[in-house]
Amino acid sequence: IQQINKTAQQLCEYLAVQSWVDEIYYPTISCDALYQKGLKSGGGGAGLFSIVLKSPEKNSPQFYDALQLTKGPSLGTNFTLCCPYTMLAHYDELEWVASIGVSPYLIRVSVGLESLSTLIARFDAAAENINQESYRE
């Protein structure tokens, strides 16, 4: 668990500064002060995070398809999984989900025991498949 926490934290920190990433949802990066206050000291942010890309309606399908991770809605394995969470969990409620600010293009990732460098390489390779003009400022 400690290795998964550490890798997830470092991966989220890396992804948070990439030009093609719009939002990272991970406890130690994107949560409010009240949530931060309740975190257990030394407990880590866990191995689960979500990512929304810039221009997600264009970029998420290509990115997800190119991302060389096992695809599935599970979590807690020793290998990293990803899934288009909102589409899987709320497909019949997409209008409602959008009304509360959740992107239908959110990709959820459950980090496993792969090395940080392996995961960064896979995310970077998938990012090469998206339209760079759509996220440049």
Model-predicted segments: where are they?
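PLP-dependent enzyme catalytic core of the Aspartate aminotransferase-like
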Residues: 81-137
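Conserved small-domain helix->loop->beta segment predominantly found in fold-type I
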Residues: 3-73, 77-79, 92-98, 135-137
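Conserved strand-to-helix beginnings and helix N-cap segments that scaffold or border functional pockets
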Residues: 1, 5, 120-121
